[in-house]
A protein has these predicted regions:
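Arg/Lys-rich, low-complexity, intrinsically disordered basic segments
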Residues: 1-104
């Protein structure tokens, strides 16, 4: 497993996200280390405390706010993702919550 702040510049993730900024935000909001996802279509993964499962989040090949810094795109994504159904608001470690807090 590769921690986000140690992902090599040759990794394709740099085209879509800023792993160093993402790690800073993960530390700020969750106090956790995020890792490069082992799934080819996801950017990062995190292991919630007291859990054996890994939560993968961030879709490749889509840029996130840590990369493009476009406030209009950020607003559109946050509006769209706020309407996702389910208990993601109650689950701090849901993929949607992680994407909203760390990537957007």
């Amino acid at each position: 497993m590769i921690p986000a702040n140690k992902i090599p510049l040759s990794d394709i993730i740099w085209k879509y996200s800023d792993p160093k900024k993402s790690q800073q935000l993960a530390t700020k909001y969750f106090g956790e280390t995020i890792y490069r996802s082992t799934r080819k279509n996801k950017k990062y993964m995190i292991q919630p405390p007291n859990s054996k499962r890994w939560v993968h989040f961030g879709q490749i090949p889509y840029e996130d706010f840590t990369k493009h810094k476009n406030k209009t795109r950020r607003h559109n994504y946050l509006t769209r993702s706020a309407r996702i159904r389910g208990d993601w608001k109650k689950d701090k470690y849901s993929a949607n919550n992680l994407a909203r807090k760390i990537l957007w």
